[in-house]
């Protein structure tokens, strides 16, 4: 899948950007603070439904604006066009669409536009602990294996619930609540 064109409105410091890409290689050159990293982050957002640099969606809206929109126009290996749309208004639910059809679950989109980002922060993959390496591998594998992604989501939810119970300091004789949420 090749990203042919991107349209960005009010994303971080990018007020309005329309770019067409070469299918081979694209270079971005500019002074510090011009938005090169934010452009790459917008491309990342279209793949992962979130920013690589800021997990709080509302903080990715340009200062003094109420919303952002990112649209990517792709061509599949078979030559079919695909449009990915993301829009966020402050204090509202994020909209993520493929060919104008909204996703019911964002996890359904993960892996549709495969992407691996390598940055200077990834030096921690080598020098750091195993947690960073596991997280990186989880991201890569989740794009190609939906069952792995769903299992990872369930595992993280169970881990969070376990940690809440451990912090609750329940007396040994007390009955633990059970059931589904």
Model-identified regions with their sequence ranges:
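Generic alpha-helix structural propensity
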Residues: 23, 34, 38, 55, ...
